[in-house]
Amino acid sequence: MSVVVRHDWDHKELQALFDLPFPELLHRAASVHRAHFDPAEVQVSTLLSVKTGGCPEDCAYCPQAQRYDTGVTAQKLLETEEVVAKARQAKAAGASRFCMGAAWRSPKERDIPKVAAMIREVKAMGLETCATLGMLDAGQARALKDAGLDYYNHNLDTAPDYYDTIIHTRQYQDRLNTLEHVRDVGLKTCCGGIVGMGETRDHRIGLLLALATLPAHPDSVPINQLVQVPGTPLHGTQQLDPFEFVRMIAVARIAMPKSMVRLSAGREAMSDELQALCFLAGANSIFYGEKLLTTGNPDTERDQTLFQRLGLRPMQITVDAAEHDHPATVHAEITRSAACEHTA
């Protein structure tokens, strides 16, 4: 099956996919998935909060916002040795990528060398590295790239026309600017959003449209289901229909055929059957480990058992400490095309 990677999707096209009968949508998504990936392989990442709590933002879903009474207390940045120990445990458990998250609006200049040291140590272990630190300027993105960072996560969170319902302290354009800085230095992007925040299907389509029309599709697209934390404004929001969540995965797979589509937050509350449908619909990445920043996640034993029951296996990724010229990613294709145009 030949699948063209497009950046010119429109709202009506994505709506038509969402509106397909459920079996037909899953069939199309599974066919696209098989054209680009081994359907039995799932990329496994582990996420560690290296700086928890005290964030000045007002994201309505987030227990780390200091303005909400959620029981999360602000903590200092972890020492590099602590991070390396956690990375070693993650690798032993089967993770191929180690993600480091900090509850900052944006990192201060004094923070960058400390995070860079973490990146270098984790990368030297043979793990892919990812960081999510808030907004970056061009110089900070370059410093992280020079330290050996592979991926930078910065989510769009929701559709542009629903964004102001969820967040007031950061503009949508701020997020797009950070993604541009990250792409410009050659970092791979991890960018997705959250569903189940009271949005409509039209808003979910808007989120996928924003992602699928970026200059380069994100290399990883995390689809988070809202974890409702007492004390946050979104606690008590009506739960999303599980089949609607699967539709979100399926349309993401069709619209961004070469991206990793990740089951992210909210997986702890998902049944094994729901997760199996998501894998069938094109999800091929998960966060592995018992905690995602401050919220729960299935324990590794449950995930290993689920993989065995479904005949799935962790994706094997070889990482060299030295940088490759053109890693096999969506962004690399954009980079190559730009280089060819520049030299033509």
Curated annotation (Swiss-Prot):
GO function terms (MF aspect): 2 iron, 2 sulfur cluster binding; 4 iron, 4 sulfur cluster binding; biotin synthase activity; iron ion binding
GO BP terms, alphabetized: biotin biosynthetic process
Record text on cofactor binding: Binds 1 [4Fe-4S] cluster. The cluster is coordinated with 3 cysteines and an exchangeable S-adenosyl-L-methionine.
Entries under CDD domains matching the protein: Radical_SAM
Presence of keyword Metal-binding: yes
Catalytic reaction(s) noted: (4R,5S)-dethiobiotin + (sulfur carrier)-SH + 2 reduced [2Fe-2S]-[ferredoxin] + 2 S-adenosyl-L-methionine = (sulfur carrier)-H + biotin + 2 5'-deoxyadenosine + 2 L-methionine + 2 oxidized [2Fe-2S]-[ferredoxin]
Residues at which [2Fe-2S] cluster binds: C99, C130, C190, R262
Residue ranges occupied by any Radical SAM core domain in the UniProt entry: 40-267
Residue sites binding [4Fe-4S] cluster per the record: C55, C59, C62
Keywords: 2Fe-2S, 4Fe-4S, Biotin biosynthesis, Iron, Iron-sulfur, Metal-binding, S-adenosyl-L-methionine, Transferase
Pfam families linked: BATS, Radical_SAM
Top-rank taxon, per record: Bacteria
NCBIfam families the UniProt entry points to: bioB
Oligomer status and interactors: Homodimer.
Biological role stated in the UniProt entry: Catalyzes the conversion of dethiobiotin (DTB) to biotin by the insertion of a sulfur atom into dethiobiotin via a radical-based mechanism.
Protein name: Biotin synthase
